[in-house]
């Protein structure tokens, strides 16, 4: 037995080479579409397999299992699930703007329901799909061997329509991704026709025809025109898409809101579930219920809390909190005609498509021209046969080598003789001279046209235009499938601030947060704290008086701010309440302070490293549960204070037991960061700060009573100083309060 050859190689080099091969495989053979036909290899192989099975629009359906079997057996040696999922998506009217497959059976729903098993469903190609493979049998594209060299598959499709932009594409490769939304085919054809007539046109000229994406699920794009144009110019950007809704009047002056279209790629069932959860958690007090009345069309009914609610405000609150408004990404990363992936702008994609179509027509014309020349040679032979039929028959019957005799007698080629010898006698007898002459004349006319196309650049582009116009006529705005579904509406998002608190009854409450992080609210102010019960080993930490309409600021020890609506805090005198971790994503961090939000209020932030800064309260409002990072805290330190600025001076004291007092004007106002040095230390940390008015003196609580120091001259200094020893009687824990 021959011994295996073992080669020693560097592991790092081997790993990098194999990873590079894998990365290139995912980019070129799996995840990114080709700019010319807009297809990935799995799409191309699937559609070509269906063409081979003759699953044309006017033919019968075949089981999807049969189609998938042919694809994975002949062209695509991967799992059947991946191929079937691809087939299903190409048939879903809510996934593709122009479906390429006509499915029969359960192909899933916009609710996220899965399609039936492939043994139950059937499919065939759509008319627009046939345009992708039109003239594929006329040598218009190159073919290559399949994975096992048993068959051939097309490298690219002829693509008579711009499928990449019409249906869009998405995929994630190694180190790159693509996300191209669908567009309206009529508008794309207009842009292509203009580009043929005006080769020097720019993106701004093209954008006069292409308004923006056209999603299969409709919706409303609310971005401004300049934002949309900027995205198409760079090939990267995003679009904000809102659901389409209408107000339905009911009896007694009541109404309900009906959502008829939702953003692209949003599952309706999950959207309704999202709204229902927010409704249960009292995050959207403007509505009372939501229900799904959808059939073949989307109909989601939202009932307002009462008829006094403005439907526009109701919807603005839902747009802000739910996927009724969604952001669709644009990343036009595709494989170019040179097989190099890159991000293209919309003009480059259209130009690549036009060049592709020009090459297809050149190859098709060349192929047809060669076929015509071959047929003309045959017709020439047939006319000779017609005029000399008896002589030819006699030569065939009498001579041992009729081929040579016929070639010499009639001065024709060996190929032409083969045509004569391979023609049946019955066919020879039926020859008619006028039919041969007519066909010869017609073919010569066609030959002249094709030669003119190949020689004349303008004629070639006229054919491209003619075919694009034919596609536009068949799938234009006047057709059911071609009518634009997504509309545009500029919305000034800066003015779309929904004050939900306006719909909450204003009532006084007392918010209590324990040391263990349990928070609750009690009705009224001046609450008898002795009646409040806590969990075993727990006690109060923060007690603040607020109103149900207030926003509550929660500051963590890591400098992150969280915002809660006071009305959403659990109510009741029972032990505990609700853990703060269920309301905000504070993690295992401690709570530094809890404050009632007041607009444009200055807050002083300080960390144990001795730094701090002023921040406007408007800058710390967090819109999500994850909060907003305001103060950057180094590892090993924490945010020790967040205080409203209600004085002209600040007192700082740390582990070094040095007290420093300086004017609060020395501290800068910032939006976020670490801040500036408040008090300097050597191997110590800042423990506490206090804001006060200099004329009132500095006070502190020693645990028994409030102490006051009127003469603070000895402790005055500049920001960033070390400070001096505090007054006699200052607490030994170096804090202004116990």
UniProtKB/Swiss-Prot annotation:
Keywords: Cell membrane, DNA-binding, Isomerase, Membrane, Topoisomerase
GO molecular function annotations of the record: ATP binding; DNA binding; DNA topoisomerase type II (double strand cut, ATP-hydrolyzing) activity
Pfam families for this protein: DNA_gyraseA_C (PF03989), DNA_topoisoIV (PF00521)
Major location (coarse): membrane
Enzymatic reactions: ATP-dependent breakage, passage and rejoining of double-stranded DNA
Alphabetical list of InterPro entries matching this protein: GyrA/parC_rep (IPR006691), Gyrase/topoIV_suA_C (IPR035516), Topo_IIA-like_dom_sf (IPR013760), Topo_IIA_A/C_ab (IPR013758), Topo_IIA_A_a_sf (IPR013757), Topo_IIA_dom_A (IPR002205), TopoIV_A_Gneg (IPR005742), Type_II_DNA_Topoisomerases (IPR050220)
Topology term for the membrane: Peripheral membrane protein
Subcellular location: Cell membrane
Site positions (Interaction with DNA): 40, 76, 78
CDD domains on file: TOP4c
The Topo IIA-type catalytic domain, residue ranges: 32-496
Top enzyme class: isomerase
GO cellular component terms listed in the entry, alphabetical order: chromosome; cytoplasm; DNA topoisomerase type II (double strand cut, ATP-hydrolyzing) complex; extrinsic component of plasma membrane
Enzyme Commission identifier(s): 5.6.2.2
Active site, UniProt feature: 120 (o-(5'-phospho-dna)-tyrosine intermediate)
Gene3D superfamilies: 3.30.1360.40, DNA gyrase/topoisomerase IV, subunit A, C-terminal, Topoisomerase II, domain 5, Topoisomerase, domain 3
GO biological process annotation, one example: chromosome segregation
Site (described: Transition state stabilizer): 119
Summary of subunit composition and partner proteins: Heterotetramer composed of ParC and ParE.
Functional description taken from the UniProt entry: Topoisomerase IV is essential for chromosome segregation. It relaxes supercoiled DNA. Performs the decatenation events required during the replication of a circular DNA molecule.
Family, similarity comment: Belongs to the type II topoisomerase GyrA/ParC subunit family. ParC type 1 subfamily.
Protein name: DNA topoisomerase 4 subunit A
Lineage: Bacteria, Pseudomonadati, Pseudomonadota, Alphaproteobacteria, Rickettsiales
């Amino acid at each position: 037995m021959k011994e295996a050859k073992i080669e020693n190689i560097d592991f790092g080099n081997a790993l990098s080479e194999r990873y590079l091969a894998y990365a290139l495989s995912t980019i070129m053979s799996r995840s990114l579409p080709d700019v010319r036909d807009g297809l990935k290899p799995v799409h191309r192989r699937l559609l070509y397999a269906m063409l081979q099975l003759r699953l044309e629009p006017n033919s019968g359906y075949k089981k999807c299992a049969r189609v998938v079997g042919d694809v994975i057996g002949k062209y695509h040696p991967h799992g059947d699930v991946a191929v079937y999922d691809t087939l299903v998506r190409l048939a879903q009217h809510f996934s593709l703007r122009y479906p390429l497959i006509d499915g029969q059976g359960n192909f899933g729903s916009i609710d996220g329901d899965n399609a039936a098993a492939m043994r139950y469903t059937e499919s065939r190609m759509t008319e627009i799909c046939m345009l992708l493979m039109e003239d594929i049998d006329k040598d218009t594209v190159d073919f290559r061997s399949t994975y096992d060299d048993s068959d051939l598959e097309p490298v690219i499709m002829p693509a008579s329509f711009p499928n990449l932009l019409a249906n869009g594409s998405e995929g994630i490769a190694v180190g790159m991704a693509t996300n191209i939304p669908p567009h309206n085919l009529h508008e794309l054809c207009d842009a292509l026709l203009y580009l043929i007539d005006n080769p020097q046109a720019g993106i701004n000229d093209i954008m006069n025809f292409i308004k923006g994406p056209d999603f299969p699920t409709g919706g409303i794009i609310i971005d401004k025109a300049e934002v949309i144009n900027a995205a198409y110019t760079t090939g990267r950007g995003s679009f904000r898409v809102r659901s389409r809704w209408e107000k339905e009047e009911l009896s007694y002056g009541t109404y309900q809101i009906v959502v008829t279209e939702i953003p692209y790629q949003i599952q309706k069932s999950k959207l309704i579930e999202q709204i229902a959860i927010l409704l249960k958690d009292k995050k959207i007090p403007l509505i009372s219920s939501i229900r799904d009345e959808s059939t073949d069309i989307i109909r989601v009914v939202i009932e307002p809390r009462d008829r006094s609610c403005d439907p526009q405000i109701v919807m603005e609150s839902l747009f802000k909190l739910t996927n009724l408004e969604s952001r669709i990404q644009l990343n036009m990363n595709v494989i170019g005609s040179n097989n190099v992936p890159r991000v293209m702008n919309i003009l480059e994609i259209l130009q690549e498509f036009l060049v592709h179509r020009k090459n297809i027509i050149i190859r098709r014309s060349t192929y047809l021209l060669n076929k015509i020349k071959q047929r003309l040679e045959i017709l020439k032979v047939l006319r000779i046969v017609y005029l000399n039929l008896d002589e030819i028959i006699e030569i065939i019957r009498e001579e041992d080598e009729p081929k040579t005799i016929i070639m010499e007698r009639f001065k024709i080629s060996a190929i032409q003789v083969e045509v004569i010898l391979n023609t049946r006698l019955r066919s020879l007898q039926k020859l008619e001279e006028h039919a041969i002459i007519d066909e010869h004349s017609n073919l010569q006319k066609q030959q002249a046209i094709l030669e003119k196309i190949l020689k004349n650049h303008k004629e070639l582009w006229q054919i491209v235009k003619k075919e694009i116009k034919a596609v536009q006529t068949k799938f234009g705005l006047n057709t059911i499938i071609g009518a634009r579904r997504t509309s545009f509406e500029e919305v000034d998002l800066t003015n779309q601030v929904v004050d939900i608190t306006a719909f909450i009854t204003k009532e006084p409450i007392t918010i209590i947060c324990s040391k263990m992080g349990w928070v609750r609210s009690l009705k009224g102010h001046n609450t008898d704290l002795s009646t409040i019960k806590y969990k075993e080993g727990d006690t109060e930490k923060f007690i603040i008086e607020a109103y149900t309409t207030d926003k509550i600021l929660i500051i963590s020890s890591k400098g992150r701010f969280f915002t809660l609506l006071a009305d959403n805090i659990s109510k009741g005198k029972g032990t505990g309440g609700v853990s703060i971790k269920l309301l905000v994503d504070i993690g295992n961090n401690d709570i530094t302070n809890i404050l009632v939000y007041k607009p444009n209020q200055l807050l002083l932030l300080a960390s144990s490293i001795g730094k701090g800064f002023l921040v406007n309260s408007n800058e710390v409002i967090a819109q999500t549960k994850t909060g907003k990072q305001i103060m950057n805290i180094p590892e090993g330190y924490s945010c020790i204070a967040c205080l409203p600025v209600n004085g002209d001076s600040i007192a700082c004291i740390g582990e070094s037991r040095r007290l420093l007092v300086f004017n609060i004007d020395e501290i800068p106002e910032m939006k976020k960061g670490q801040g500036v040095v408040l008090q300097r230390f050597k191997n110590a940390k800042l423990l506490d700060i206090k804001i006060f008015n200099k004329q009132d003196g500095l006070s502190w609580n020693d645990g028994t009573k409030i102490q006051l120091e009127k003469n603070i001259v000895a402790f005055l200094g500049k920001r960033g100083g070390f400070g001096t020893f505090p007054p006699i009687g200052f607490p030994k824990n170096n804090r202004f309060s116990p």
